[in-house]
Amino acid sequence: MTTMAAATLLRATPHFSGLAAGRTFLLQGLLRLLKAPALPLLCRGLAVEAKKTYVRDKPHVNVGTIGHVDHGKTTLTAAITKILAEGGGAKFKKYEEIDNAPEERARGITINAAHVEYSTAARHYAHTDCPGHADYVKNMITGTAPLDGCILVVAANDGPMPQTREHLLLARQIGVEHVVVYVNKADAVQDSEMVELVELEIRELLTEFGYKGEETPVIVGSALCALEGRDPELGLKSVQKLLDAVDTYIPVPARDLEKPFLLPVEAVYSVPGRGTVVTGTLERGILKKGDECELLGHSKNIRTVVTGIEMFHKSLERAEAGDNLGALVRGLKREDLRRGLVMVKPGSIKPHQKVEAQVYILSKEEGGRHKPFVSHFMPVMFSLTWDMACRIILPPEKELAMPGEDLKFNLILRQPMILEKGQRFTLRDGNRTIGTGLVTNTLAMTEEEKNIKWG
């Protein structure tokens, strides 16, 4: 193993790179493997990180950048960290550190949702940089699922584009109620009237998707100018205005701390010498070090214990709903787990294969299907961090479901997954979002339904 390989391995565990307990064992093991002069610096970095404890002294809010590919979402994320780092509110993350997968750097696009943290004077933020490329909408759905609000990035020289619409639609479907707009690349446009037209288009689009288009804060600027320290009006000051708007327009959500904990697993990592880490955003409840838990879904029912919790490299004794965290789990290998599982308090919830739901079928104009569908139509359901093939079972009196209709019908999943009353989901067919819904009831499977052939 090379020094670079070891560093890559450690960077691949963004929530859990340096647990205090057992770090000596980890570092000694790496020293024996590498015998490289560069390692002591790595060791010192890990040792320092291991001592940090997350202090909950401000309200915590989850936000994210959404928008069309190459409109500057990642550049803006980097610029925010740079500006806040000057006052001690963040650690500066370069563009390359946010787009950290080799394929992303090679293609110049964000594929997986990336997470950074920062603090304003009023709040602590976990910021998700959501992928904008059309091929990676599945990852974008996972990225936006836990967001309390979004920053929609639109390039002034392009205006709203296809993924601008799709991201707004998906954000609306999964319950993101507050959006702030950043019109980026204003330095590339000489005509101020063009910028005004772009702003008008954006406000109309927001209204079309059910947001308050006239009230939504729209900030014009250049993330690249902010990042490079040029043109303070378009650069530094625009990002400061954006952060003020996020602080004031996106409310601190009410967190459900009373119910048993529920953590949808976004990713799974292996930390050498320590064990396996699952990451995600705690949907509800309180998760503490030492808690017993179950991991459910995808035909799995695994019982284990949480032996450590971190948020952005800082240790936590307890995590609260809304926290973006990594949890070390006892006695499990990375290959035992996968994204889409849900970590819960033992016995608090069980997977279901059949639900009743209220579903809005998107019209052709909204990017949905052009034609109606019949019973046993098979889209893919997306909810929390999982996706699963399902069958739509229309009521006996309903022969066809038409685009634009709001219907109640049953859904049967290929495998039981975590579903409960009030849970939101999205239905997709190929690369098209066809519907959005809410679970109204969980149902028992009939013998006939248990024998359905899925092919």
UniProtKB/Swiss-Prot annotation:
Binding residues for Mg(2+): T74
InterPro entries: EF-Tu_GTP-bd (IPR041709), EF-Tu_GTPase (IPR050055), EFTu-like_2 (IPR004161), EFTU_2 (IPR033720), G_TR_CS (IPR031157), P-loop_NTPase (IPR027417), T_Tr_GTP-bd_dom (IPR000795), Transl_B-barrel_sf (IPR009000)
Cellular component terms per the entry's GO annotation: extracellular exosome; membrane; mitochondrial nucleoid; mitochondrial outer membrane; mitochondrion
Modified residues (Phosphothreonine): T281
G2: region residues: 108-112
Alphabetic keyword roster: Acetylation, Disease variant, Elongation factor, GTP-binding, Host-virus interaction, Hydrolase, Magnesium, Metal-binding, Mitochondrion, Nucleotide-binding, Phosphoprotein, Primary mitochondrial disease, Protein biosynthesis, Transit peptide
Disease: Combined oxidative phosphorylation deficiency 4: A mitochondrial disease resulting in neonatal lactic acidosis, rapidly progressive encephalopathy, severely decreased mitochondrial protein synthesis, and combined deficiency of mtDNA-related mitochondrial respiratory chain complexes.
Protein name, per record: Elongation factor Tu, mitochondrial
